[in-house]
């Protein structure tokens, strides 16, 4: 047994300049540190991060967004309870914190407080054993490098532009190694920048490092991406050695009106109504959709473009629409739930029963402990679903999710573009892991979609 000797929390800053929490854990022979990210578009069923609004710390940071209350909870409540535990007893530690909080969504102590301790404990254990985190969590079975979903154009809550869908991503599925996938991404990203600039569009980037131009439709976004893939010397396709496929995170909960049960492309609508330059003659463009109309809209996009994955195509309250689309195209396309299931086995179980999705996005801070995250992945995998480990829009230089993507054999990772250090840090970590694994390293490419018949 190697006891945990010290747990300490502090406030640090995330990639948006907002406070977040950092946890340090020291055992007799090991040390681990973890920083917790936060999201901009969040599911209602996520575990709750604790912020300082309404507390005595409210004025410490802009908008009451400090996390000193969560820091206090770690230092004064969690630490005294967990110090003395064997650092290798991950699940017992996680369960003890869940019990200590006592609420379904961890709103008492804060999911940010609990997750930070959970991850720092795992990293301290790995350090104690003198092995990397992916080896500690995954054992000898952690050898698959994930296919990256690389954000190339930001919209929605992640950018101040006219694009309503939150993320447009590329997937280098024809690559043979993770390093080659990064080389593909590098070429497509910079060719996209050149194409945007050549047509007078902004090449400033959004929260996750993708470009954030004012474009007139989602189709125009996709046309630019297809052109960039071709200009880089690859094929916008779902098959072949040169294939680069496209993925979309629509984040449609942000577009949904609960009363009317309709979806509105709000940013495009505003640009048209205010006659933003270039949008003056778009008055007849459709900006409002019923659930059924949005199902057909996505199916039409799937026919026109090499899209292989769609995340949160509908609101987290619109389960029927998810099921309808999945029943229609789920055999050939990855239909992924984020806000719908929030990395929670309770909601993943419902998604399995209703056949709403065939893939689960995995965000550790949606559920709040490493053990529960592993349970969510196991449940999804047993049901034949794919899983994608994901960052959040408010990130840090912490690279834990890179190790976990390998350790847990998810096969896919979504962690932003190849700009902004908070995003690139994860890719750099994966490049190191691939080199460490040597000849046993595996990059599956298109084969990662084991549950699809890709056409």
Swiss-Prot record:
Tree of life domain:
Bacteria
User: Which residues does the record give as Mg(2+) binding sites?
Assistant: 249, 311, 338
Q: Which GO terms describe its molecular function?
A: magnesium ion binding; phosphopyruvate hydratase activity
EC number(s) in its UniProt entry? 4.2.1.11
Entry-linked Pfam families: Enolase_C, Enolase_N
Q: Please give the biological process terms from Gene Ontology that the record holds.
A: glycolytic process
Give the first-level EC class, as a single word: lyase
Q: Identify the catalytic residues.
A: 208, 363
* Key word Nucleotide-binding present: no
Q: Which cofactor does it need?
A: Mg(2+)
Q: What is its main location?
A: cytoplasm
Q: In which pathway does it act?
A: Carbohydrate degradation; glycolysis; pyruvate from D-glyceraldehyde 3-phosphate: step 4/5
Query: What HAMAP family has UniProt attached to this entry?
Result: Enolase
Record function comment:
Catalyzes the reversible conversion of 2-phosphoglycerate (2-PG) into phosphoenolpyruvate (PEP). It is essential for the degradation of carbohydrates via glycolysis.
Task: Specify the protein name.
Answer: Enolase
**Organism expressing this protein natively:** Mycoplasma mobile (strain ATCC 43663 / 163K / NCTC 11711)
Q: Which gene encodes it?
A: eno
């Amino acid at each position: 047994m190697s006891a945990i000797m010290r747990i300490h929390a502090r406030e640090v800053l995330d990639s948006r300049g907002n406070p977040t929490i950092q946890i340090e854990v020291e055992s007799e022979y090991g040390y681990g540190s973890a920083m917790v990210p936060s999201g901009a578009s969040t599911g209602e069923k996520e575990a709750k991060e604790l912020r300082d609004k309404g507390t005595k710390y409210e004025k410490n940071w802009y908008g009451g967004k400090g996390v000193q209350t969560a820091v206090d909870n770690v230092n004064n409540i969690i630490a005294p309870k967990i110090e003395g535990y064997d650092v290798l007893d991950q699940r017992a530690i996680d369960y003890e914190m869940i019990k200590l909080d006592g609420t379904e969504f961890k709103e008492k102590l804060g999911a940010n407080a609990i997750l930070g301790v959970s991850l720092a404990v795992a990293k301290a254990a790995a350090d104690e054993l003198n092995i990397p985190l992916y080896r500690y969590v995954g054992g000898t079975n952690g050898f698959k490098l994930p296919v990256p979903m690389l954000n190339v154009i930001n919209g929605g809550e992640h950018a101040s532009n006219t694009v309503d869908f939150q993320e447009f991503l590329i997937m280098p599925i024809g690559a043979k190694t993770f390093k080659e996938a990064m080389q593909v991404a590098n070429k497509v990203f910079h060719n996209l920048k050149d194409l945007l600039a050549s047509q007078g569009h902004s090449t400033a980037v959004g929260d996750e490092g993708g470009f954030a131009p004012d474009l007139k439709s989602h189709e125009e976004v996709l046309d630019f991406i297809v052109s960039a893939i071709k200009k880089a010397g690859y094929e916008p396709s779902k098959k072949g050695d040169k294939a680069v496929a496209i993925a979309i995170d629509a984040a449609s909960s942000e577009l949904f009106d609960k009363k009317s049960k309709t979806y509105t492309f709000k940013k495009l609508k505003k640009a048209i109504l205010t006659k933003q330059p270039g949008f003056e003659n778009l008055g007849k463009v459709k900006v409002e959709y019923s659930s059924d109309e949005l199902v057909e809209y996505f199916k039409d996009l799937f026919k026109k473009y090499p899209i292989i994955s769609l995340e949160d195509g509908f609101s987290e309250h619109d389960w029927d629409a998810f099921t309808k689309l999945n029943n229609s195209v789920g055999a050939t396309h990855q239909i992924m739930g984020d806000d719908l299931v929030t990395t929670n086995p309770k909601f993943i179980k419902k998604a399995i029963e209703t056949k709403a999705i065939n893939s689960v996005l995995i965000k550790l801070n949606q559920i709040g402990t490493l053990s529960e995250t592993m349970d969510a992945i196991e449940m999804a995998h047993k049901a034949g679903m794919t899983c994608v480990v994901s960052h959040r829009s408010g990130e840090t230089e912490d690279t834990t999710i890179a190790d976990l993507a390998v350790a847990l054999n998810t096969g896919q990772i979504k962690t932003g573009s190849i700009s902004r250090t908070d995003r690139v840090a994860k890719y750099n970590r994966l490049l190191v892991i691939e080199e460490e694994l040597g000849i046993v390293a595996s990059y599956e490419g298109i084969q990662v979609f084991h549950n699809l018949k890709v056409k």
